[in-house]
Structures are given as C-alpha cells and as structure tokens.
Amino acid sequence: MPSLSDEQKRRVRALARSTSDAKIGKKLGLEPGAVKAFREQEAAAQRQRRERVFKILLPAVPLLLLLLCEALLRLTDYGGSLALFVPAETAPGYLKINENVGRRYFPALAVAPEVSNDLVRTAKPPGTYRIFVLGESTTAGYPYLYNGSMSKMLQQRLRDYFPDREIEIANLAMPAINSFALRDLGPELLAQQPDALIIYCGHNEFYGALGVASTESLGRWRSLINLYLELQQFKIMRFLRAQIAAVQKWFGPAHSPAGNANATLMEQMVGDQAIPYQSEKYRRAREFFTANLKDLINAAQRQGVTVLLANLVSNERDLPPFADIFNPVTPRATFLAALERSRQLATQGNLQAALALCDSLQQVDAAPACLHFQRARILEGMGRFAEAAAAYQTSRDLDGLRFRAATDFNHGLAEVAQATGAVLVDVHAAFTRASPHGLIGNHLLLEHVHPNLHGYFLMAAELCRALQQQGMIAVDWDQTRARPDSVYWQERGVTALDEEVAAIRMAVLLNNWPFVPRERSWPLRYQPKDYLQSLAYAMWRREQTWEKVHVLLAEDYEKKGRLELAVKEYEALILQTPHNPSPYIRAGLLYANLQDFDRAQDRMLRALALTPSLEAYQVVGAILLNRGQPAQSLPYLQKALQLAPGDGRTLYNLATAHLMLGQTEPARTCVAQLEKLMPGSAEVAQLRRSLASPQPAR
C-alpha cells in the first residue's frame, strides 16, 4: 500500500475530525485502507507519546504533592521559625537567639530548651570581635544561667582588656543537646561571621537529644541522623515528625519517664540505663562525638574562625556512681556484702584492711563502679591523693548510667584538637589545681556536672587566659587594664535572687531520679518566706521573666532605703541586657544618691550612648558642674532643657554654668525663666544677685 505524502497526511488530519475514512479516501483519491492504516498509525504514535509523558510525570507527582504541602505549610507558618537567629523586636539592628530553635532536637518530648537573650548586630561592624559559645547546660550556666554563665564572666574581663573595641559574645548553649545539635547549628552560626568559637560539650552524648541511649535516639547511623537534622528546614518534615511523635506517644508505654509530665527533662531523656564501658554503644557515642566536632571545627577553620575546645569536668569525689554493672557470673550479694565490710573497716580506721579487701574484690570483678569509689575513699583517707583521684575517675568511667563523660571523652577532645588544629583549653587541670588535694568535688560543683559560681568563675578565667596566650583579639594584651579577681567576683552580676532561683532548680533536680530512687522522688514543696523568695518562685514557675523580677526586687529595696542592694539588681540587669538604657539610668540615679559620682556619671554616659535621656543629661551635667567643669556641663544641660524646656533644676544649673563662664546674657535669660517658674525662690534670688556682680570666666 503506497505511503501518503506530507500534504495528504495534513489533509487527512484536518478531515478526520468530521469525515469517515471512506469519504476522505474518495475526496483525496486514496484507497480507504490507506486512510485507515494512517490513522491507526497516528493513534499508536499518540499512545506512545502519552505513555512516555506518563512515565516521566508519574515519579514527579509525589514530589509535586510534597512541594504543594510544603508551600501550604509555609503559607500558614506551621510550627513557626526554627532558625538559630531571628530579628530582635526590642533592639532594631540586632539579632537574638530564637527561643524555639531547640525544638528541632526533641520530636517526641516537644520541648524548647531555654536559650540566652544575648544579641549580635545584624550587620557585623568593622573592627568588632565576635565570639560564639557553644555547648550544653553547663555552658549555659545552669542552674544560675544569665550572669552566672562562664560567657558573661568572660565578657567582664574582656571589656576591661579592650575598652575601646566592641566584643560581642553570644552564648548559644542549650540544655539537653549534644554534638549533633552543635554540628547542625554550624552553617547558621558561621553565616554570622564569628571570629572565634568556644566549645564546652560532651556530657550529653548518651542521653542528650538524638544521643545513642536517649529516648530521642534515631538509630545507629550518624549520616542518617545528620541528614534528618538537615531536613528540618522543610516544614513538611516537621509536620511528619509531629505526627509520628503523636502516634508513638499514643501507643507508647503508659508509665514511661518520657511520657511523665512530672519527670525532670533529665529523667525523660534516658533510654538505656546500663551502658558498659567500651561497649559497642559506648564506642558509637564516642565516635559520633568526635566526628561531629571535627565536622564543625573543620567548617569553622575553612572560614578562618579560631576554635577553643575546652575539656570536661565532673564531680569525681563527692558523687557515688549511679549504676553498677557486674560480670554476669559475679555473685552480686556476696560481692556487695564484702564491700560493705570494707566500708565498716574503713569507718573503724582500719584502712589497710579495708583496702586489701577491695583489692581482693577487684580480682573477682573489676567492673562495678562502686568498688572503685570505695577504694578511692580509702586511698584518700590514707593520704594517697593521686591514687585516690585515679580511682575516683575510674569509678566515674565505669558508671553505667552515663550522665558524666568518661576520661576517654577528654582523650577524644585532645584527639580532635590535634587533628583539626583547635586550641585545647585544659579546664580539667584548672579544676584539679583549685580542688583540695586535687580531688574535684563539691568544692567546685553542685551535683554531677554543673559547677557552682566559683567553678564558672574559674572556667571564665581559664578561657580568658587561653584567648590571651593564643594572641586572639589582639597580639598584645595590656595587663595593666586587668583588675584583680576579687573585683570581678564582686561585680559578677549574680545576686541573692539568682542564687535563690538556682537553689530551687537544684532542689527539684536532686530530689528526683537518678539522685534518689523514683519511688522516693517528690515534687517541689516550696513556701516563700519573704519577697525575694516569692519573686524567685514566680520566676522558676515562669510567671515572671528574669528581667522583671530583678526590677521588682530593686524597686522594693529602694522603697526600703536599701540603695546598695537595689543598685546591685540594676547592675545585674546592665550585664545581662547591655542594650537596654533603663537599668543604666536607674543605677546612675542610685549612685548619685549614694554620692558615688564616678559610677553615676559612667552609667549615665553609657545610657546616653544608647538613647537620649532627660535624667541622664541632667545627672551628667550636674556632676560636671559640681566638679567645676561648667564648659563641659553645658552641652548636657542644654540637651536636657531641649527635652524638658520648663524644668527648673536644669534651668538653675544652666544659669550657674553660664555665670561660672562669665556668660551673663544666657544666664540672665535662664534666671528670668526661673523667676516665672519659681517666684520667691531664695536660690533664684541669689542667682539674680550674682548677675549684678558676675564672676570672672573659668
């Protein structure tokens, strides 16, 4: 059958919509079979094209649906922003740490760990030195937080060393996170152009968010966990995560700690409570830890960011191990009875026999942490402190409930520093030197891992020393600018109110598992005895903010005439919220009342660097005038008058300044205004008499 020409094909296609094959063939002089064959061929080709398109589009349909869902979720702002930094509403031109950023890491518990309120400029100014501090609850300063953190204490020292340079320190630490979170935050924090990172992290590698033994664990593969975190930028991923968590909660164990609203976060995060030293799970946690840190540090150094990596401290002497792990063949009851006998011998003063009994038990089973803790106690009693320290550390390392990082993790930090070129800061050595007999315990720590204020103060001093030794910020540091440690301690900005809140947090922590058995745990029974305690309790219950309770307490002190205590509250606010002019002004007024005019002037000038203020202009002008500096006082008094044109005290000081400078006409104008405002005033009359006999200009 002859094939159709292109023209015939075109005409067949045109007629095919309304004409039969026979009529088309007759009209075009073609055999009916030729038309039918052509149309069947066309139909087959069209079917093939449709199949190809379908095969191409079919895999794209789920992707298109996901994109549509993502668009809808973004349109409705599902879950809000989980970005690390967001604009600070109260400080235009600054970024704050997003209070919701921690929600990335707790899909099942749906909690948002508390973050600091540190600010950084949106656009980093030239010459600014920017430091980000990364880590867990210790790095955040728990249980004091705020000015009780090592970052705030470090900032005090750096401000003295570099008074003419802006140094930004933002503490990005969050409770209950670990190295996975630090690695995940890396790209966002590096985008803000830090000059240095300070990292103190490692105690949460087992039970922190996504840790290998936590209730939030996502499995054995580090690459998959990090991929999961990277996908959190998509809202569809967060939506699916929330649905899965809801199903798990619905069908999960009814009485698990993770589902207990009364359990502490520490308790809710624990999955596996018995992890042997150097077990597969233990080694995996350590490998994840070092690999995550290497990823973060390498990324930072590619950007020219210096990294300080601090090693870890924990309570070695004064915290018995939480969980013992025995060899399966060990007769546990017999073993523990013998260990109790060793304790009795030690109590009776027979230390040598007690130690010998421990040594014999070690031949039976060296795995239980309690054995090494008892040996350490005996060795300490014998004055063999170096051996005692080693035994305490062994006890800590063998503790099956891994809330304290083992010595092996500090070795890992040293390996990371060696491999990446990060600066290793030996905080553990500093704590050892500062502890009686070199045994780290309650002298510097509150419980298992969180330092007391002296501990945080020591960490800040050690970090400052490391910055100086490395020539960071500047090659040469002017040592004459540093003040004694005693001054930094007095000005640390942690008041009795902060210590009371910390005491409440500690009471809750230490009266719950694992510090006491679950059956003996109890909810907080706190009865405030005075106004300070009522404010502390309100803050702990999140009924009042940190800033508000300090202001309320300061106002109460002022009403009672306790100005020295009131000014300490405002100084705490200045340290924590340096971009807020209000506490500078309130402190300046109190210092003026206390006759401390140097501090009054300093605080008011710092307030004026932030915003115009009538009170600040008035106080600075008055101080300069009283010091016999009328020319320097004039600009401040004139600005005060612009803000309050009819203010009598400002007019009086202005008139006095003009008279002291021999400027009679401006003085006369001020006196005339004063006479209208304050008719019959003896002070104004004295000014009028002074106009009649002006003083020589000063």
Task: Name each region found by the language model.
Residues 79-162, 434:
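Membrane/wall-proximal cationic-aromatic binding patches
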Residues 148, 203-415, 419, 427-442, ...:
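Serine-dependent acyl-ester chemistry module
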Residues 194, 365-367, 400, 544, ...:
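Short coil turns that delineate tetratricopeptide repeat
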Residues 347, 381, 559, 593, ...:
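Register position in tetratricopeptide repeats
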Residues 374, 552, 586, 619-620, ...:
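Canonical tetratricopeptide repeat
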